[in-house]
Amino acid sequence: MDFEKDLRAVETNIPGLIVFDLPVHGDNRGWFKENWQRAKQTALGLPDFGPVQNNISFNAKKGVTRGIHAEPWDKYISIAAGSVFGAWVDLRPGDSFGQVYTTVLDPSVYGQINVYGVTTKSERH
C-alpha cells in the first residue's frame, strides 16, 4: 500500500468527474485514511455540497456487478476494501457526450471519486 502520499485531485476527460488520490497513513497496527476532509478537498476543486444519502454495499463474492444509478445529485464514492473496476459514460449533450472514463479503485490508490454537476439522462426530459 502506498503510504504518506499527498492528497491530490485528478481531472478526468469527463467534466465534473474528479478522482481524489487520498493519503493513507500506515504503521504496524494497520492503516488510516481521511475519507472526507471538507477544507482540504474543496481547496482542490471539490464543490461544497451537502450529501443527500450515504450508502455502503458489501459483495460476498468476487465478480459481483453493481451499478450506480443516475440520481440527480452529486456522488462521492469510496472503497473500503478490495478493488472495484469503475466505468463512467457522459450522456449529457455537448462536446463531452459519449466520453468514457474507467479506472480501478481501491482504498490506497484512487480512493475517492466525486461526480458533481453531471446531469443525468433522466433530467433532460
Roles of regions detected by a PLM:
Residues T103-H125:
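Conserved metal-binding segment of the jelly-roll/cupin
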